[in-house]
Design a protein with these regions (language model features):
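N-terminal intrinsically disordered/low-complexity leader segments
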Residues: 1-16, 27, 83-96, 218-231
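Short, basic, alpha-helical segments at the C-terminal edge of helix-turn-helix-like DNA-binding modules
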Residues: 41, 69-76, 80-84
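Alpha-helical DNA-contacting segments of helix-turn-helix folds
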Residues: 64-71, 140, 144
């Protein structure tokens, strides 16, 4: 519950108020879906005056859209290193190539683990993201999906990638799995250690999938060695 001091601070800082409203909206959206979300309900959860909430978001649709966009950017910031606010790849980022496969695989494994752990520890947020993707006319406009697909495409187009990879299919299969896996984790893992182990399992299998779905055969020995040493 917001204190009087919190409310006074928010009156002086509209950005803080907006951030509090969006955080509350994520909670309501994950719990009740878009049908159960209203500006007044979110205002109550956020601990702000309803009139203040309406100053930021006059209609429910504006609040839903702003909340979904903030979730995509939160995912982007959490699992990708650098880049622009619209999903752009950072300038100067090392591109994958077969002469540096050890480093490429290390980076892929680290990314897989970051995303798997984040999805497991923030399953409500991921549920909101899935809702957004399912409700969009063009899911590829989502900044998080856009950046993920670009990463898969960069790997596929490198001299380590196989020809004719369907980048869109690979991206959808992998991301869907990342955000469904927490359902199984919730049913089986009762501790942070157990959740981390299940995150590791998923991350390693995504890496193995890349071996057969994206990478050329002559790179497999390096990836197999990595898997053997980390399984």
């Amino acid at each position: 519950v917001a204190t009087k001091q919190d409310n006074n601070r928010r009156k002086r800082d509209p950005e803080t108020t907006r951030a509090a409203i969006l955080e509350a909206a994520k909670t309501v959206l994950a719990r009740d879906g878009a049908e159960g979300l209203s500006v007044s309900t979110v205002a109550k959860v956020a601990g702000v005056n309803r009139g203040t909430a309406y100053q930021h978001f006059q209609v429910k649709e504006d609040l839903v859209r702003a909340t979904l966009d903030s979730v995509s950017h939160q995912l982007l910031d959490a699992v990708f290193e650098g880049g622009g606010p619209d999903g752009e790849v950072p300038e100067g980022q090392l591109k994958p190539d077969r002469d540096h496969m050890d480093e490429v695989i290390e980076r892929m494994a680290a990314f897989n683990m970051r995303l798997a752990e984040y999805a497991i520890e923030n399953s409500d947020l991921c549920r909101v993201w899935l809702f957004d993707v399912l409700s969009r006319e063009n899911p590829r406009q989502d900044v998080f999906y856009k950046r993920f697909e670009q990463a898969v495409q960069t790997l596929a187009e490198s001299d380590a990638g196989i020809e004719d990879v369907d980048v869109e299919v690979q991206s959808v299969m992998i991301l869907t799995g990342y955000f469904m896996w927490p359902v199984w984790v919730r049913a089986h893992a009762r501790s942070k250690k157990a959740r981390k182990e299940m995150a590791r399992r998923y991350a390693m299998e995504v890496l193995r999938n890349a071996m057969y779905g994206v990478l050329q055969v002559d790179t497999h020995s390096i990836l197999k060695a990595y898997l053997k040493s980390h399984m």
